[in-house]
UniProtKB/Swiss-Prot annotation:
Its EC number is 5.1.1.7. The lineage of its organism: Bacteria, Pseudomonadati, Pseudomonadota, Gammaproteobacteria, Enterobacterales. Pathway: Amino-acid biosynthesis; L-lysine biosynthesis via DAP pathway; DL-2,6-diaminopimelate from LL-2,6-diaminopimelate: step 1/1. This is Diaminopimelate epimerase. The record marks H171, E220 as: Could be important to modulate the pK values of the two catalytic cysteine residues. InterPro entries: DAP_epimerase_AS (IPR018510), DAP_epimerase_DapF (IPR001653). PROSITE patterns: DAP_EPIMERASE. Gene3D superfamilies: Diaminopimelate Epimerase, Chain A, domain 1. GO terms for cellular component: cytosol. Keywords: Amino-acid biosynthesis, Cytoplasm, Isomerase, Lysine biosynthesis. It comes from Buchnera aphidicola subsp. Baizongia pistaciae (strain Bp). One of its GO terms (biological process) is lysine biosynthetic process via diaminopimelate.
Length: 286
């Protein structure tokens, strides 16, 4: 019996990393310009049974701006490109240091919609300047959204009230009384894929524990529920501060750990601090 061995021509190196269980593969696209970014390839790689398995794929690219250190691209597990990922930003910062792409511990990184400032702290945590939260809904969702209205939607026999915020990507935020018993996956999927959000939306379920602490679960568009969502933590805290429910410094309890969010409100920038972990390096063939 003869077995035909198929040799695939493109070898791609990657690092597996995670921020509180929100996991990624990161690829240095500055050195590996042949990596083809297609939805089909990303979906195959993200499969946790037949591929590597991850929530998002992150690319490190050269910046076209001399004042920016790197360009940061983010692809969800379903292959769609998005503009923000807070946990990914922390892993991005650790990656470029570990791979000696820079010696800087303060990095200026562009995305498709904004510029992030990433600070790698001496204790190994990363503090991310996430910019200014946006509550101007027409800037986020277009002219069909009514500003300052009570947003609600019917799900089975109940009415769900929600708020909308952007922190570089869109978030729908729902306050709940008992996060452990709430049907996060069912309602998360329903809202995330609803026709009122043609590009999808991240759905955040928030239980306010005190003025300086919340519990949070997030159903991410194009991924599903994740163990943590950095931008979701930022958006949820920003809304709580704006509504007077929270103080300016808040601990966010996610399924797999804790993030610290600091925002003084108004036009001030919001800061997120948390860990980033390198798991292993590997390669795959295409």
């Amino acid at each position: 019996m003869h077995i035909k061995v198929v040799h695939k021509s493109v070898k791609i190196k990657f690092s597996k990393m995670h921020g509180l269980g929100n996991d990624f593969i990161i690829i240095n696209a500055m050195m590996q310009k042949t990596f083809p970014v297609t939805s089909n390839i990303i979906q195959n790689l993200s499969n946790r049974y037949t591929g590597i398995g991850f929530d998002q794929l992150l690319l490190v690219e050269n910046s076209k701006n001399v004042n920016i250190d790197f360009h940061y691209r983010i692809f969800n597990a379903n292959g769609t490109e998005v503009s923000q990922c807070g946990n990914g930003a922390r892993c991005f910062a650790l990656f470029v240091l570990l791979k000696k792409l820079t010696k800087k511990r303060t990095l200026y990184v562009s995305t498709n919609t904004t510029t992030l400032i990433l600070n790698v702290l001496n204790n190994g945590n990363v503090c991310v300047d996430m910019g200014v939260p946006c509550f101007k809904l027409k800037n986020i969702f277009g002219e069909n959204i009514i500003e300052n209205s009570l947003h609600s939607i019917k799900f089975v026999n109940k009415i769900i009230n929600y708020d909308l915020v952007s922190i570089g990507n869109p978030h729908c935020i729902i306050y709940v009384n008992n996060l452990k018993k709430y049907p996060v996956k069912k309602i998360g999927f329903y809202l995330s894929t609803h026709k009122i959000f043609p590009e999808g939306i991240n759905v955040n379920f928030v239980e306010v524990l005190s003025k300086n602490e919340i519990a949070l679960r997030v159903y991410e568009r194009g991924v599903g529920e994740t163990l943590a969502c950095g931008s979701g933590a930022c958006a949820s805290v920003a809304l709580g501060i704006q509504q007077g429910l929270l103080f300016n410094e808040v601990q966010v309890n996610l399924l797999n750990g804790i993030l610290k969010i600091n925002w003084k409100g108004g036009s001030e920038k919001l800061y997120m601090t948390g860990p980033a972990v390198h798991v292993y390096d590997g390669y795959f063939y295409l």
